[in-house]
């Protein structure tokens, strides 16, 4: 069974991810057998619908279209993270987010959703998008999870607290396991009580970013208040952790378990976290999960020193 990985981010780590995809094609001997980069998820700044992580700044039209094309030309779909928990139905009219949908809707690219009204809106107006049920929903109840599979989601991203709970995972019917996506390196503390609040703070910060003028987004005019201030000041030490500081968590999925127990059970979609993490952290996660041990030093160095062509 092929292991399918979903990697971060189409904007922050665009060049790194394109380099990774090309390296897998050019040097398959560096990597574990039967792996695939099945999508690259994220969003463009400063999209109001974006959730999970806050993203400020400005993306030009040419940057957006060239990014989508670069991934699609490599047979990798982009996957918008439209999971802002603060959205209301009024936000469905957002011009920029609708434009992002219009230029990416080709039956190949995907959307991650968590709000029913946004999901319904997308189904009506952009029906070609395969939809992914977000981990932001924080579903830990088995019956509630089974309800998700009754919908036509391409994949359902499990709450990370399901990780390594093999008694619960074994209850998921075999025929549904290929539609399960597992977040294998969660930085959140297991069963974090503030996770919902953190998502909401990030969502409010994203809303503030989307309201900035173009001059503020370009940095030509200083904002009265940094729209990212609340997100940056949220008291969560995990946001400063490196990859190896989370490997002791009960919810961390080891590479041995990915290629052993999980694939053996029929789970083959794996999400790697890291949208706004530093480049070295993201590289380390790729090296750990994708690269054969004897090539890890070489691949790590090549990724760290790679300079994209202008």
Which residues make up each language-model segment?
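Active-site pocket-lining/capping segments in soluble small-molecule metabolic enzymes
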Residues: 1-144, 153-310
């Amino acid at each position: 069974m092929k292991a399918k990985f979903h990697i971060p981010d189409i904007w922050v780590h665009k060049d790194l991810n394109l380099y990774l995809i090309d390296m897998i094609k050019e040097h398959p001997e560096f990597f574990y057998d039967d792996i695939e980069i099945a999508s690259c998820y994220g969003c463009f700044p400063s999209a109001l619908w974006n959730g999970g992580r806050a993203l400020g700044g400005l993306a030009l039209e040419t940057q957006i279209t060239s990014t989508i094309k670069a991934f699609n030309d490599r047979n990798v779909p982009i996957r918008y993270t439209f999971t802002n928990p603060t959205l209301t139905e009024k936000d469905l009219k957002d011009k920029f987010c609708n434009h992002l949908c219009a230029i990416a809707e080709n039956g190949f690219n995907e959307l991650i959703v968590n709000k029913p009204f946004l999901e319904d809106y997308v189904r009506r107006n952009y029906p070609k998008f395969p939809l992914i049920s977000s981990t932001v929903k924080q579903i830990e109840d088995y019956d509630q999870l089974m309800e998700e599979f009754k919908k036509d989601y391409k994949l359902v991203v499990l709450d990370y607290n399901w990780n390594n709970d093999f008694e619960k995972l074994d209850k998921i019917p075999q025929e549904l396991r290929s539609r399960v996506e597992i977040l294998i390196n969660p930085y959140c503390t297991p069963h974090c009580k503030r996770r919902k609040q953190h998502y909401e703070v990030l969502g409010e910060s994203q809303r503030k970013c989307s309201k900035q003028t173009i001059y503020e987004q370009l940095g030509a005019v200083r904002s009265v208040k940094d729209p990212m201030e609340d997100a940056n000041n949220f008291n969560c030490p995990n946001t400063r952790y490196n990859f190896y500081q989370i490997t002791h968590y009960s919810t961390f999925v080891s590479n041995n378990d990915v290629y052993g127990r999980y694939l053996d059970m029929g789970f083959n979609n794996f999400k790697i976290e890291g949208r706004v993490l530093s480049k070295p952290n993201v590289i380390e996660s790729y090296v750990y999960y994708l690269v054969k041990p004897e090539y890890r030093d070489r691949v790590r160095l090549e990724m760290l020193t790679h300079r994209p062509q202008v």
